[in-house]
Regions:
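Short acidic alpha-helical/loop segments enriched in Asp/Glu that coordinate divalent cations
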Residues: 19-24, 54-71, 133-134
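The canonical Cys-X-X-Cys-His
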Residues: 4, 41-56, 118-122
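Electrostatic cytochrome c docking/interface patches
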Residues: 10-46, 60-61
């Protein structure tokens, strides 16, 4: 435990407590002047995502799972092994922010339009539904604007 704490102190040397570190977090979304287009997103997915996440969003399983403990080399993006409808990635804005900041892996070259479109495409696919989602937001004044759960108190 002491070694872990010493390592954490070493990592944070030169930073104020609570300071933002370059590369931390996701970029602020640059909204489109149009709706996200899942059809365009499907074309982007085929060209830039399917090689890693599978043609049908099934992901690529790790053949060495027993040794590594990592079930997927690249995660499933829809279907039973993917995130459910309560996950942050299922929210269009949050998902697009993540996609913009990280995809394709090692390149992060998608435009905001591409990020929104491919996120809309991915989230249009079947996945597990989180039960009782309305209970996630008993106070609608703090519900994120890109949640698909009504009633809507945010003008959208």
């Amino acid at each position: 435990m002491r070694a872990m704490i010493a390592y954490m102190h070493w990592l944070s040397a030169g930073y104020e407590v609570g300071a933002k570190v370059k590369g931390q977090g996701l970029p602020k979304a640059q909204f489109l002047d149009r709706a996200a287009n899942p059809k365009k997103g499907g074309e982007i997915y085929a060209a830039k995502c399917a090689a890693c996440h599978g043609e049908n969003g099934e992901g690529i399983k790790n053949e060495g799972f027993a040794q590594s403990g990592d079930y997927y080399t690249f995660p499933a993006l829809w279907g039973d092994d993917s995130y459910n409808t309560g996950a942050g990635m299922y929210r269009l804005i949050e998902g697009a922010r993540y996609v913009k900041a990280t995809m394709p892996k090692g390149d992060a070259s998608l435009s905001w339009e591409e990020a929104f479109d491919v996120t809309a495409y991915i989230n249009s696919k079947p996945r597990k539904i989180k039960p009782d989602r309305k209970k996630d937001f008993p106070d609608l004044d703090v519900k994120q604007m890109d949640m698909d759960v009504g009633p809507y108190n945010d003008g959208f």
